Amino acid sequence: MIKKLIAILTLATSSVYADQTLTAQAWLVADHNGKILEGSNMSEVRSIASITKLMTAMVVLDSGQSLTEIIPKKLYNKQLTREILIDLAIVKSDNNAAQMLCDYYPGGYNSCIEAMNQKALALQMINSTFTDPTGRMHTNVSTAHDLIKLVFAASTYPLIVQASNMDAVRWNISKKKNIEFRNTNSLVGHGYKFLVSKTGFINKAGGCIVMMIDTANGIRTVVLLGSKNTKTRIPEAKMLSMLY
């Protein structure tokens, strides 16, 4: 009985602590089964910025297009494969990479956007709408509750899991020059194991991040929307993953 009471008090204290220290307008933490452990404003529809790129990557992978195909249009003065564009979209959150993935989707850009919304419906993300592949438009919206479904779906794609754990995208552009783009989640590459990681920011959305991470308490999925800025979102998400 005493242990149960202590557990209840600890959980209540944790909830109050999180509410007092977070700048995020909506958030939640879920366990390995998707059971929500704690959250706030989970059903509030909000702009999700570059979290959108997870959906872009998924529909491109669903299409069955060759990952080794070189895309005709250049990025960083180089023709890149579809796989590298996916890496750039997830790791660097590169808008041009995400745009190109959609532009070269079967049927073109509009078919890509349609596929993103159809995928959302298939995942029962009933409060989510996608209007562009990058997240630059504030009309890409979802809820913390819907994004749990997105993260769990993304975790079943090996390439997304791989990219989520890359601290940077690197390649040689000449014998003497390398190019490197760091992961927008600064936790990656510092001893943490991620199944999914994606950040986002536009003024309308605020600082955003979704991540599925292996913690001392087990697998935790964190969705955080509307944080004050790009500097607050990651510490807040890290705190939530450790708190619950």
Language model features: what each stretch is:
Residues K4-T13:
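Sec-dependent N-terminal signal peptides
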Residues T10-L11, V60, L240:
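Enrichment for repetitive, rod-forming helical segments
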Residues Y17-H145, K149-P158:
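Active-site-adjacent loops and short helices of periplasmic peptidoglycan-processing enzymes
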Residues D19-A26, A30, G107-Y244:
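Penicillin-recognizing serine hydrolase domain
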